[in-house]
Structures are given as structure tokens and as C-alpha cells.
Amino acid sequence: MQPTATAAAIPSGITLATTTPTGQTIPVAIGTRCFALGGTLAAILNKPDGSGIYGLIVADAAHDVTGEWGEYGQNVPNAKGPDGAANTQAMLAAGSPIAQAVRALNIEGHADWFIPSRLQMLALYESVPDLFDKDSWYWTSSQYSRYPAWCQDFEYGISTAGSKDYSFRARPVRSIQLQPFTPSQLPQPIAEGDPRAILGAEVAA
């Protein structure tokens, strides 16, 4: 039976935000295009350890990597969990060519890209299938056994095992921290006559 990817439950009326590398707090929602973060917020998930939630940023299709999963006939024991970043690191250590290509990416100053796990990929299918090519198969970072690894279809949502020596696409993603957001966190407009309007925002109110 195919597992179900359960998105994080966000209480009614709660807005989420993240912080950019420059320290700016920005509200986000599924489908938000975040140039400063390298792509589109595509899923909001519970952390595997239950310590909170996180968001998955999906890179544009132009950054897709195509190739073999690698390590055909080899067991990669640490590439079976729900954390795509940890799986990708295990693939990298084993010599996977697509893991090497994804980890070498630098998009908008971010170099922490990874291949999503099977569960993360299922969440992407549930939330943003239109960001993926319906005629392509996409590798996940989740190994099935020594010979196949899990791959994902975005036309019918099929998650199946494909031979590691097949050449499929891999979509880079990265994770971001999310926190509750209130409008007061946004920079407030400077009123007319405020000294900061003349001397600069660094002047104390």
C-alpha cells in the first residue's frame, strides 16, 4: 500500500513566516514564489522527530538533474528514512552521481539542496503537482533495496520502485524553518513628519 504524506496541521487563523538570509521576516503559504529562498514553497510538513514544522522549497525545473540513482546492486542503508537531506548525504557518500550534482548546486546563494525522500515527494505531488513534468519520472532519495530506488510520477501520483541504473530526473529541494507570524513583524511605514523620513530609518523614533 502506498503511504500517505500528511501535511502539517496549521491552526485556523495562523499565518506562517520564514526569515531570509538578510534577516527579513516574510509571510509564506503553499505556492509562494520566494526568490530570496531559491524557489517556491511547495509543502509544509511535520518534522520526523515531532519537534515542529518545516517548509520545502522546490527549485525551478531549469535546475533539474537527470541521471542514474547510482549504486546498482549496493545497499545504501542510511538512504531509507523520511529526511531527504540525510538520504542525499548517504547517497553522496556512496558515490551517487545525481546526489553529487544536486549537492553541487548554488541557487540564489543557497547550497543546501537535496533530493526529496519518498514521503516528501508524495507531499509535493499532493500540493504542487503542476511544478513537475507530467511526462517524466523523478527520483526520490529513498532506496527500496540494493537494485531499485523509489521514484515518483506526477501525472497519476504513482510512487514505485525503479532500477537504480535508469536515468530519471531529480528535482532539488531545500528545507526552511517556519514560525507563527503576526503583521507586527513586518516593517511599519514611516509616517509623514517622522524624523526617520528625512534622516533615515536608523534614527531612533
Spans of features found by a protein language model:
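Short aromatic-cysteine micro-motif
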Residues: L45-F114, R118-L119, L124-S127
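A broad, low-specificity signal for short, low-complexity segments enriched in glycine/proline
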Residues: T15-T22, G73-N78, V102, D133
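A structural motif
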Residues: T19-G23, P27-I30, Q100, S167, ...
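GGW-centered surface loops in extracellular recognition modules
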Residues: Q2-V65
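C-terminal, surface-exposed recognition/capping segments
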Residues: M1-A9, H110-D112, R118-A205
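Short acidic (Asp/Glu) patches
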Residues: F35-A43, G95-A99, F154-G157
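Intrinsically disordered, low-complexity, compositionally biased regions/tails
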Residues: A17, P27, F35, A42-A43, ...
